[in-house]
């Protein structure tokens, strides 16, 4: 299997995840999550798992072997690297944080992976007696690495979970990109947005009179909005069904056809007779561990699945802890804002481990649609979601 095909598989897996989250956790609400963040966390968990658990994770994310796991990890992580100058109109960063109980230490191979492949910051903490401090530390870390967009990934309600934890792995993604062709704010006006229940809300719509990357397909159309570029290329894609209530049908089609997103990329700019996109801003959070288990990924959440992460040779009574580690919870939170200037978005994933084409067209996004933000060269999907009601912030 080529690396490119492996990356495409990651996209298909995350589309299936979206299909599962939308009718259950996100039922009737706007949705945004980061496939990149969740995928990297799963790869990291796989690297510290026993053979049987690792095989299930590899099968779940459609990778044939650990060699491909390492290659996909390197490719995904490299998307955030920028060899050029820092710029104010384009920024993507990822960060990795680890909190390990003071009674444990990392196995050398896993420590090497954390420090050299992920450049992770590692912290020793006291989960049992100071869980509130750990929660505050993780939340402060998340706030710093999302530029203040996500101030809380662990709530006070999670204190029992944290008290029983021995290890926390976290990933944060932050993206800010300016449109390559910005919208003129003076042209932004309020129009009706048609909800799935047939009602309408007034929301501000952006427009311009430039040619757009737009392509028509049977039952839907796809818009590609590029951001400014460095050596990487980022774009937002909006998948708009022709029917105002057609989003569920479109989602079913997207999730049932492999490579759908990769096979529906507008390549040509065309003139538009009508072009309107709503501004939107919202956040979404869910317990990803529940969704992953419902989708069949169960072994990481069973006793003794994470045998390659930690050790405690100097404290014999803790040996069973190192051998019986498992994932207790995976929390995920993301937010996004789209306006005339561009897009700002962020996401955090936290896993706690416990011992136990036309010449002229139109694109008026005045009813529910799907969207993605992706890096074009690698195909990595940074963010994915649905907009049901852009008036809800």
Curated annotation (Swiss-Prot):
The keyword DNA damage does not apply. GO terms for cellular component: extracellular space. Keywords: Protease inhibitor, Serine protease inhibitor. The keyword Cytoplasm does not apply. It comes from the Eukaryota. GO terms for molecular function: serine-type endopeptidase inhibitor activity. The record marks 356-357 as: Reactive bond. InterPro entries: Serpin_CS, Serpin_dom, Serpin_fam, Serpin_sf, Serpin_sf_1, Serpin_sf_2. The reactive center loop (RCL) extends out from the body of the protein and directs binding to the target protease. The protease cleaves the serpin at the reactive site within the RCL, establishing a covalent linkage between the carboxyl group of the serpin reactive site and the serine hydroxyl of the protease. The resulting inactive serpin-protease complex is highly stable. Probable serine protease inhibitor. Belongs to the serpin family. This is Serpin-Z4. It comes from Arabidopsis thaliana (Mouse-ear cress).
